[in-house]
């Protein structure tokens, strides 16, 4: 904070205390902290009127470019790391013994509630891409403390195709291509066929692109497979699974890479349906360990898909 004595030390408390008695308590806490930090930021950098107006215009531009299927504010929060930070605050689990489950990361905007259930061993590839490398993905779900298999968990997987586009972005893909839900068996096992993921760039035609360019940062996202795992007794796990040889791991534009989510894809020679093999085991924590055990999983900004609307966005 600036120590410049020109600034009235009573101004910020005056603004915070202007909230009336009917303000909900949580809103009072959140808005009060927000006002204090924004005021401290302005004092610290001694924000000029021109810079303030530039910020106002930038915020306006976020709203102007957003549509029902393009949430630019969501993307801005991603590129400044806010969504990843909120996810860490909301979902980080560490027991008193220092035990943690498989890491949680951001959901991203392109999860769909409409993915169909498939049988173990099925493929989520409905529209083959000639550049796609078919992968046999398999693993076991276990309790992080006991190691017991977790039976009947729902594993919801989705990914972009080999062209870097999700199903509803690409008119050549059918609905729910590269999406599916599976249930773990009596041994906690799961398996299916998918693609080795493909890296892609965030859209750079809007405010997020302007901001990334200003900060001299790459818009690239490393290749990843999305996975959300739910069970009535366990805290939800949301993953993005990354190939260890992806060149963008250290410069992920949304700061979602975590060490235990980086995996090795290995050649597969004993299965005519797959070129690669991915073993990915997951540990889950009982809900009692979650900081907010009754919280619902996050909902995608684009939960309501409109198949008639095709865009060129990527995230």
From Swiss-Prot:
Superkingdom: Eukaryota
Record-listed Fe cation binding positions: 166, 200, 224, 226
Reaction(s) this enzyme catalyzes, per UniProt: 3,4-dihydroxybenzoate + O2 = 3-carboxy-cis,cis-muconate + 2 H(+)
Cysteines engaged in disulfide bonds, as pairs: none
Disruption phenotype: Abolishes growth on benzoic acid, benzaldehyde, benzyl alcohol, p-anisic acid, p-anisyl alcohol, m-hydroxybenzoic acid and p-hydroxybenzoic acid; and reduces growth on p-coumaric acid, cinnamic acid, protocatechuic acid, p-coumaric acid, and caffeic acid.
InterPro entries: Catechol_dOase_N, Intradiol_dOase_C, Intradiol_dOase_core, Intradiol_RC_Dioxygenase
Signals that turn on the gene: Expression is induced in the presence of caffeic acid, p-coumaric acid, p-hydroxybenzoic acid, protocatechuic acid, and benzoic acid.
Region (Disordered): 287-315
Keywords of the record: Aromatic hydrocarbons catabolism, Dioxygenase, Iron, Metal-binding, Oxidoreductase
Cofactor field: Fe(3+)
Classification via SUPFAM superfamilies: Aromatic compound dioxygenase (SSF49482)
EC number: 1.13.11.3
Protein family (similarity comment): Belongs to the intradiol ring-cleavage dioxygenase family.
Oligomer status and interactors: Homodimer.
The protein's role, per its UniProt record: Intradiol ring-cleavage dioxygenase; part of the benzoic acid degradation pathway also known as the protocatechuic acid pathway. Benzoic acid debradation begins with the conversion of benzoic acid into 4-hydroxybenzoic acid through hydroxylation by the benzoate-4-monooxygenase bphA, and its partner NADPH-cytochrome P450 reductase cprA which act as a mediator in electron donation from NADPH. 4-Hydroxybenzoic acid is then converted into 3,4-dihydroxybenzoic acid (also called protocatechuic acid) by the p-hydroxybenzoate-m-hydroxylase phhA.
Protein's name according to its UniProt entry: Intradiol ring-cleavage dioxygenase prcA
Organism: Aspergillus niger (strain ATCC MYA-4892 / CBS 513.88 / FGSC A1513)
Taxonomy of the source species: Eukaryota, Fungi, Dikarya, Ascomycota, Pezizomycotina
Gene: prcA
